[in-house]
């Protein structure tokens, strides 16, 4: 039992060690924005594939890979800024990032593939990109020209001690005072890198002027906003309230005169008690007066147009030769066209008097030639029919007679219609008055028995109702 347990423990420990994937120590790399930075990564053993991952590496692969290789060549590059400038055949897979930015800061992982489970090599690199450094040259002014006159003036009194020439070598310290070229080394001792820490704060202060111009742009935008009062022409569009003439269309309430049409109830429709005078059917003798249409036999006098036969006869009295013009026959003649033989000096020919298809032109010998629209095909002569003034008078008489007869008929019809209208109106008035005044007398008359000997006459006279109905019924009472 102990051997399987020990074997299981060994397997678990080996798995824990392999899960570590032989992770190397994490490396921190600092850089400056705008420059290139190299993230180191090398491996040993056989040449194999590898990948660079943005962020920590997972157990099996590079989930956010930015560069992939097959061992000798780059197979994938997320951006052109990512380059492997090392010798891949010598297992140098260091990553170079060109033109770095502050956003490039973060964790990078170099993963090298090895055979076997959990044998991949992983190197985690923490990259920190700082802002770019601005170097400000420091100019130092050394006023050495002021010291040279002072040294020359001081040496002149010392030249008076010529006997003590031994002091001259001591005065040879003047060349030592010519350390002015030594002061020229000051540009070399411009320890600018030492003072570069100060400019790192200075750019932060110099950013303030950069922000100040941005604030100066605000006044430039303010004048642009002053153009908004120029857009205050919108109050000029307040002419829209002048369109408040629409309330003047409130004259529609003046159309409330429609309630004045409520005078219809004042038509005293309760006076429709006339239907209560339905006793009029008791006077159903009034339909007996419908014999008035029998008087419409007057239109039978329309036989008057038959009198037009009188005007169609023309006496056959020849007249001397004269020019004749064609006369159009009356269109009102309803009878068939009559032909009259006319005897002239030449040959005779009968022609219908009512035919509108012939027109004649006469020459001096009373011969008639057919017009260009005639029906004859040969050039033959024809005598024109004889027309007398008596025939013209008869046609005029026909017109006059027809007109007079029509007027008479219209007058008769007008009289009949007017009489019928007034008669009907009078009958209605009489029936209403009779029903109102003699209703009780009629009831009394109905109660009495009517004997066979009573002389009751119902005259079929159209104009009998012109009498007073009261007098009529008084005379009929026993």
UniProtKB/Swiss-Prot annotation:
Classification via SMART domains: IG
Residue spans with biased composition (Polar residues)? Answer: 348-370
Q: Which UniProt keywords apply?
A: Cell membrane, Disulfide bond, Glycoprotein, Host cell receptor for virus entry, Host-virus interaction, Immunoglobulin domain, Membrane, Receptor, Repeat, Signal, Transmembrane, Transmembrane helix
Q: How does it sit in the membrane?
A: Single-pass type I membrane protein
PANTHER family listed in its UniProt record: HEPATITIS A VIRUS CELLULAR RECEPTOR 1, HEPATITIS A VIRUS CELLULAR RECEPTOR 1 HOMOLOG
Gene designation per UniProt: HAVCR1
Signal sequence, start to end: 1-24
- Start and end residues of each stretch annotated as Disordered: 187-303, 320-339, 344-370
Matching entries from Pfam families are given as: V-set
Q: Name one GO molecular function term.
A: virus receptor activity
Q: Does the keyword Cell membrane apply?
A: yes
Record family assignment = Belongs to the immunoglobulin superfamily. TIM family.
Q: Which residues lie on this side of the membrane: Extracellular?
A: 25-397
**Quaternary organization:** Interacts with STAM. Interacts with SELPLG.
The Ig-like V-type domain covers which part of the protein? 25-126
Reading the lineage from the top rank, the first entry is Eukaryota
**sequence repeat locations:** 148-155, 156-161, 162-167, 168-173, 174-179, 180-185, 186-191, 192-197, 198-201, 202-207, 208-211, 212-217, 218-221, 222-227, 228-233, 234-239, 240-245, 246-251, 252-257, 258-263, 264-268, 269-273, 274-279, 280-285, 286-291, 292-297, 298-303, 304-309
GO CC annotation terms, alphabetical: cell surface; motile cilium; plasma membrane
- Cytoplasmic side stretches: 419-478
Q: In its UniProt entry, what is this protein called?
A: Hepatitis A virus cellular receptor 1
UniProt subcellular location: Cell membrane
Region called 28 X 6 AA approximate tandem repeats of L-P-[MT]-T-[MT]-T, residue ranges? 148-309
């Amino acid at each position: 039992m102990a051997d399987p347990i020990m074997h299981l423990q060994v397997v678990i420990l080996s798995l824990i060690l392999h899960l570590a994937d032989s992770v190397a120590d994490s490396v921190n790399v600092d850089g400056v924005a705008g420059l290139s930075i190299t993230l180191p990564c090398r491996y040993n053993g056989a040449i194999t594939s590898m990948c660079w991952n943005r962020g920590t590496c997972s157990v099996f692969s590079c989930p956010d890979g930015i560069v992939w290789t097959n061992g000798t060549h780059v197979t994938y590059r997320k951006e052109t800024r990512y380059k492997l400038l090392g010798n891949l055949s010598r297992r140098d897979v260091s990553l170079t990032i060109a033109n770095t930015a502050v956003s490039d800061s973060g964790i990078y992982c170099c993963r090298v593939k090895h055979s076997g489970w959990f044998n991949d090599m992983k190197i985690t690199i923490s990259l920190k990109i700082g802002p770019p450094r601005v170097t400000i040259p420091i100019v130092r002014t050394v006023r050495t020209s002021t010291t040279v006159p002072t040294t020359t003036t001081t040496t002149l009194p010392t030249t008076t001690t010529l006997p003590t020439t031994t002091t001259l070598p001591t005065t040879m310290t003047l060349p030592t005072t010519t350390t002015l070229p030594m002061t020229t080394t000051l540009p070399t001792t411009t320890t600018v890198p030492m003072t570069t820490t100060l400019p790192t704060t200075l750019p932060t202060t110099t950013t303030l002027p950069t922000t100040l111009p941005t604030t100066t742009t605000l006044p430039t935008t303010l004048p642009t906003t002053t153009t908004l009062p120029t857009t205050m022409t919108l109050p000029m569009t307040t002419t829209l309230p002048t369109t408040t003439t629409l309330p003047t269309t409130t004259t529609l309430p003046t159309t409330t005169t429609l309630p004045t049409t409520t005078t219809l109830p004042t038509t005293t429709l309760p006076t429709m008690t006339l239907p209560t005078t339905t006793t009029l059917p008791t006077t159903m003798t009034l339909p007996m007066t419908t014999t008035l249409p029998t008087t419409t036999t007057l239109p039978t006098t329309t036989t008057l147009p038959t009198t037009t036969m009188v005007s169609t006869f023309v006496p056959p009295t020849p007249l001397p030769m004269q020019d004749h013009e064609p006369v159009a026959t009356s269109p009102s003649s309803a009878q068939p066209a009559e032909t009259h033989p006319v005897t002239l000096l030449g040959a005779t020919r009968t022609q219908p008097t009512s035919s509108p298809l012939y027109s004649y032109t006469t020459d001096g010998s009373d011969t008639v030639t057919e017009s260009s629209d005639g029906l004859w095909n040969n050039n033959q002569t024809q005598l024109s029919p004889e027309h007398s003034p008596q025939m013209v008078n008869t046609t005029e008489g026909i017109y006059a007679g027809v007109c007079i007869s029509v007027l008479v008929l219209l007058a008769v019809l007008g009289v009949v219609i007017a009489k019928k209208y007034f008669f009907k109106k009078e009958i209605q008035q009489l029936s209403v008055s009779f029903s109102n005044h003699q209703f009780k007398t009629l009831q009394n008359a109905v109660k009495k028995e009517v004997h066979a000997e009573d002389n009751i006459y119902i005259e079929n006279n159209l104009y009998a109702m012109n009498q007073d109905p009261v007098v009529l019924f008084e005379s009929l009472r026993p």
